[in-house]
């Protein structure tokens, strides 16, 4: 497969650094399978769906997983080192995989202090620049420490242009987020849903269901040849309960469409769908990799933001709609100056 067909040039000024205010005022590009493109707003969403259609949200919660700490000087001839840490994945009660900068100034056994009573020891260094951190707290105490001292882990294309702040605590967390905080990135299509929009969704007779997928940093990593040769992506934990699976199958059998809100919800549905399109309850990791030519079994439409060029997510939307149509839609979005990525505008894909 030629990965160059999934590349496109995006002007940097179209990368949104803050969400629209209010968030349901973002623009919405409606993409029909016959090639029609309609410029709308997110609040128009109910107009393009049918009574009984089911919006499927990812209810994961984002951890304030970005930390600033200090590695004390090792001797009188050296200095303390300021360290930026981004937690990636929980590995045990106190153990977390993380990315740390400056990695070259760190070694096994180093202690990093984030606040009084909150620290971690480097248990080991891993390939790809990751480190394994052994924290001095776990469970609810760890979550409380992150809430007190961590910042929201903004995507790299935002973080390199501005630091996270208190506003991101509100705007980078969906209203569906459950209590299980384990994601290091938000399911960003869900950020557009305000109480006002949710009321309009309900008034239009649309249904809502939730699934859960904990989003990892792999969502921002570039595709590599091994992903194609192995037909696998990074693993992410996901869950669909038996009750939700039954309701989704019943809705579809009655003629309703399943409309995942975001690629993480779509990956969850597709990873739990059989060849007949029936959705099965499941809990555990998935490394599903959807690309053009792969069957899409459980997704009838998709609401999603605009994705990075050359990314697995742009390949996913191309699997649903076709590569040529998605390239045309993105070209239109760029020409019309839609805002891209996590805090940007959205599109509604109707095959």
Swiss-Prot record:
Pathway(s) the chain acts in: tRNA modification; tRNA-queuosine biosynthesis
One GO cellular component term noted in the UniProt record for this chain: cytoplasm
Recorded superkingdom: Bacteria
Annotated Pfam families: Queuosine_synth
Keywords: Cytoplasm, Queuosine biosynthesis, S-adenosyl-L-methionine, Transferase
Coiled-coil stretches noted in the UniProt entry, renumbered to this chain: none
E.C. number: 2.4.99.17
Subcellular localization(s) per the UniProt record: Cytoplasm
GO molecular function: S-adenosylmethionine:tRNA ribosyltransferase-isomerase activity
Primary location group: cytoplasm
Gene Ontology BP term (one): tRNA wobble guanine modification
Keyword set includes Cytoplasm: yes
Reaction(s) catalysed by this chain's protein: 7-aminomethyl-7-carbaguanosine(34) in tRNA + S-adenosyl-L-methionine = epoxyqueuosine(34) in tRNA + adenine + L-methionine + 2 H(+)
Keyword Endoplasmic reticulum part of the UniProt annotation: no
InterPro entries: QueA, QueA_dom1, QueA_dom2, QueA_sf
Binding partners and assembly: Monomer.
Family: Belongs to the QueA family.
Function comment: Transfers and isomerizes the ribose moiety from AdoMet to the 7-aminomethyl group of 7-deazaguanine (preQ1-tRNA) to give epoxyqueuosine (oQ-tRNA).
Protein name (record): S-adenosylmethionine:tRNA ribosyltransferase-isomerase
Gene name per UniProt: queA
């Amino acid at each position: 497969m030629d990965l160059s067909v999934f590349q496109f040039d995006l002007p940097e000024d179209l990368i949104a650094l803050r969400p629209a205010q209010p968030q349901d005022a973002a623009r919405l590009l409606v993409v029909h399978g016959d090639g029609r493109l309609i410029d709308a707003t997110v609040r128009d969403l109910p107009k393009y769906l049918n009574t009984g259609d089911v919006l499927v949200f990812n209810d994961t919660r984002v951890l304030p997983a970005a930390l600033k700490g200090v590695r004390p000087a090792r001797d009188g001839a050296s200095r303390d080192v300021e360290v930026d840490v981004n937690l990636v994945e929980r590995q045990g009660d106190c153990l977390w995989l993380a990315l740390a900068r400056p990695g070259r100034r760190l070694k096994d056994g180093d202690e990093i202090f984030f606040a009084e009573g909150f620290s971690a020891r480097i248990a080991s260094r891993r390939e790809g620049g990751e480190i394994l951190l052994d924290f001095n707290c776990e469970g609810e105490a760890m979550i409380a420490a992150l809430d007190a001292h961590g910042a929201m882990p903004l995507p790299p294309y935002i973080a390199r242009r501005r630091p996270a702040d208190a506003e991101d605590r509100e705007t980078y967390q969906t209203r569906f987020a459950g209590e299980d905080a384990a994601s290091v990135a938000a399911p960003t299509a869900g950020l557009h849903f305000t109480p006002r929009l949710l009321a309009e969704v309900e008034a239009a007779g649309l249904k809502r269901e939730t699934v859960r997928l904990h989003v990892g940093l792999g969502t921002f990593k570039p595709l590599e040849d091994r992903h194609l040769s192995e037909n696998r992506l990074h693993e992410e934990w996901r869950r669909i309960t038996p009750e939700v699976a039954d309701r989704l199958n019943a809705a579809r059998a009655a003629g309703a469409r399943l409309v995942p809100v975001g690629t993480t919800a779509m990956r969850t549905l597709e990873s739990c769908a059989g060849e007949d399109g029936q959705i099965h309850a499941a809990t555990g990791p998935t490394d599903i990799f959807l690309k053009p030519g792969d069957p899409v079994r459980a997704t009838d439409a998709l609401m999603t933001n605009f994705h990075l060029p050359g990314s697995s997510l742009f390949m996913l939307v191309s699997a649903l709609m076709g590569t040529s149509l998605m390239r045309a839609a993105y070209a239109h979005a760029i020409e019309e100056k839609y805002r891209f990525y996590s805090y940007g505008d959205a599109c509604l894909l109707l095959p």
